[in-house]
Amino acid sequence: MHRFTLYTHPYSRGTNVVWMLKECGAQYDVKLIPFGEAMKSADYLAVNPMGKVPALKADDTVLTETAAIITFLAEQFPDKHLIPAADSLARGEFYRWLCFSIHLEYAGFDKINRVPDSSERRKAIGYGDFDTAFATLRNHLAKHDFIVGDRFSALDVYYTGLLNHFIRVMPMRGIPPVFVTDEPVFSAYIDRHTARPAFAETMAWAQQAAAELEKQA
């Protein structure tokens, strides 16, 4: 098995990678990278030239991008059944929903940043508009407990993190929510998967890591 080192911050998407590592039962080390100068330092830029977290070092190979890291880990621990079989149609569905998430992210942040919407802009952009993207996901989750198949997968780590961030975390930090009404389908999905023991362990880690960074500040 590879030796894993995760570079992350508790208030970043790296928390989803911690959750995934715990679901996998992986052995790993964590290096906390404070926001600001440390993340743009020469030492860290040698790890990730983008100067962002998370980054996962597997032996001497560095992986970045949360979706890529989570998918890689699912493949590394086949006994955990966190990704459909490679020769299955469900694996194709997995890739479809993995790539679909970009519509949600772009459209969601457009909403947060109050980017003006119009029919002309919807025709011009290369990703789905907010209403269509989230309606597509909402309709899917109204019929399914999981993003793909009939069991929890790496995609549920990714999507739970994404939806939780938009619906619950951002408002807690004073950022206007992307939805102006209750979202029972999304809330039920978030509640279902944040009830997992590995998520609770991840939140405990995040609290401890945040306290550690505060002491270092």
Predicted regions and their residues:
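A late-sequence structural motif
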Residues: R196-P197, E201-T202
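GST-like domain detector, emphasizing the conserved glutathione-binding G-site
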Residues: M1-A124, D131, R138
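GST-like fold's C-terminal all-alpha helical module
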Residues: L89, L98-A195
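Short, solvent-exposed turn/loop segments enriched in Gly/Ser/Thr/Pro and often Arg
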Residues: P34, A154, A206
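Residue-level recognition of oxygen-bearing side chains
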Residues: A68, V185, A198
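Active-site-flanking alpha-helical
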Residues: M20, A74, L162-L163, M203
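Acidic/histidine-enriched, glycine/proline-rich intrinsically disordered or flexible terminal extensions
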Residues: A206-A217
